[in-house]
């Protein structure tokens, strides 16, 4: 929550803007810390902080801003965009969706499983670019599952005291999101999903163990909604066409991950899918290179940020033309004649 406020603020200031920021109400302690810091560093006429929830956000959206930058869910992104449209305000929307990871079996599967485990469990899966589900070539399915289990134990249970005791493993941000993620698992279990690993929860501590689900199908909510938690459904596939057919049935994701050493497979997946950004043989790096644009497409976001892209996003590219001498434009003043027509023909050819 700190990064998601400060990161765009830096670019807004760099582009010469005065700014109002509203931190998430779901991380109230961070919001308070940000408010204190900003008030110490800036005059309120330069950068102001508004704390609060939906009522405060609703009032802010009534104002005629020059630009609005929002990070959150597609559902709230639609509300922001609708409000901005009343003033024809430009928006940057960093949203989310179901970011898939494709595993074709041509990489070292232990290493691949380790990367996926890290990306899925970072901040307990509560990042907008976390891998939401995995598509694994059917011959590599069991090896990947075994590798994922080993990676979870390696990362969060090296002393064999249990993952719940790990100081490196996070918790779900609040009770409502804990209940939402838990309900996704329960719904999947009721509809036939198998828990390959994990499944333990502690409501009081808002702890959800990293959980790997197999035998999932599209009727399960875990394959319909963005998970935003440490749950990874795994789907096996036979051929590349199966992968793209499934992926293209979803709204375009914020990130697509391709774990492959096969150039033909990689190019096929790139050519036949749409995503905000793509990582090949790595996870979670679509937003860290300042030379690359970061952002979604359609349901996963509007606009691009990162490096110069953020600077331009918070700027108005204003063209200015000044005549230094002469007045050649008089050549095309009316009344029009054949000479002017010939002049236009030459200009068009040029």
Locate predicted features:
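ALDH superfamily catalytic-core signature
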Residues: 42, 75-217, 280, 348-349
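A generic structural signal for well-ordered alpha-helical segments
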Residues: 12, 84, 148, 188, ...
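Short internal beta-strands
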Residues: 20-25, 134-135, 282
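Residue-level signal for inorganic ion chemistry
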Residues: 16, 47, 68, 97, ...
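Short glycine-enriched loop/turn motifs at secondary-structure junctions
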Residues: 62, 95-96, 127-129, 165-167, ...
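Conserved C-terminal structural/oligomerization subdomain of aldehyde/semialdehyde dehydrogenase
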Residues: 102, 207-350
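Rossmann-like NAD(P) dinucleotide-binding subdomain of oxidoreductase/dehydrogenase enzymes
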Residues: 1-111, 166, 237
């Amino acid at each position: 929550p700190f990064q998601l406020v400060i990161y765009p603020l830096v670019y807004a200031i760099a582009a010469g803007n005065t700014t109002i920021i509203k931190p998430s109400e779901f991380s109230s302690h961070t919001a308070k810390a940000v408010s204190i810091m900003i008030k110490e560093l800036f005059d309120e006429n330069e950068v102001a902080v508004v704390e609060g929830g939906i009522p405060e956000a609703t009032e802010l959206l009534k104002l005629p801003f020059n630009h609005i930058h929002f990070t959150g869910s597609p559902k709230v992104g639609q509300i922001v965009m609708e409000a901005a449209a009343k003033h024809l305000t430009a928006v940057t929307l960093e949203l989310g969706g179901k970011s898939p990871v494709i595993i074709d079996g041509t990489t070292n599967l232990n290493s691949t499983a380790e990367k996926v485990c890290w990306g899925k469990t970072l901040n307990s899966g509560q990042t907008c670019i976390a891998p939401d589900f995995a598509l694994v070539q059917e011959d590599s399915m069991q090896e990947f599952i075994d590798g994922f289990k080993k990676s979870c134990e390696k990362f969060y249970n090296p002393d064999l005291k249990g993952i719940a005791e790990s100081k490196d493993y996070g918790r779900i941000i609040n009770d409502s999101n804990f209940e939402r993620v838990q309900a996704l698992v329960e719904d999947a279990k009721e509809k036939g999903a198998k828990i390959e690993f994990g499944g333990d929860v502690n409501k009081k501590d808002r702890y959800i163990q990293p959980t790997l689900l197999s035998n999932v199908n599209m009727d399960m909510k875990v394959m319909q909604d963005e998970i935003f938690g440490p749950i990874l459904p795994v789907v096996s596939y036979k051929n590349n066409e199966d992968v793209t057919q499934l992926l293209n049935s979803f709204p375009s994701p914020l990130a697509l991950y391709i774990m492959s050493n096969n150039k033909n497979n990689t190019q096929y997946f790139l050519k036949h899918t749409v995503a905000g950004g793509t990582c090949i043989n790595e996870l979670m790096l679509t937003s860290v290179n300042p030379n690359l644009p970061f952002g979604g497409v359609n349901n996963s976001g509007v606009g691009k940020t990162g490096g110069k892209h953020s600077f331009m996003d918070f700027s108005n590219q204003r063209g200015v033309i000044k005549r230094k001498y002469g007045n050649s434009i008089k050549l095309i003043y009316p009344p029009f004649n054949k000479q002017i027509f010939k002049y236009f023909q030459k200009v068009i050819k040029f």
